């Protein structure tokens, strides 16, 4: 969203929720390791959905049969299943969040759930002092309470 907000003139506003802005060296090394691993194939769709929900932090927030859960899984030619995400995405390393925010040609709202252990609002406030705390929510605030995000967007038009 931040890249689009910085490159397109027809986007008025983007919101970044729970964006991790502070990375330890060991986290960056783990990301590189993940990027270099081969795709992990699973025997059943159910196993793949379970894995997707786990790595996405969505266990207990999203039902296994939901479109959200199912969209996180891809089917191979040999009737095996994998996560839809390409492991190569982790090769990006530390995202330049501050640079992307400052380059955006639209309004950027940054927010984090009050209980987000991965991406706290204090880290976001180093980039944008107006970053918002989403009360009572965690890292997947957009799933936990979509109405809270709509409210935030509506208040900041």
Walk through the language-model features, giving the residues of each.
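Flexible "cap/lid" loop of the alpha/beta hydrolase fold
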Residues: 2, 6, 10-45
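Active-site loop signature of alpha/beta-hydrolase-fold enzymes
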Residues: 22-24, 118, 140
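Conserved serine/cysteine hydrolase catalytic core
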Residues: 74-127, 133
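Catalytic histidine-centered segment of alpha/beta-hydrolase-like enzymes
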Residues: 137-150
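Conserved aromatic
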Residues: 42-43, 134, 143
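C-terminal alpha-helix
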Residues: 152-157
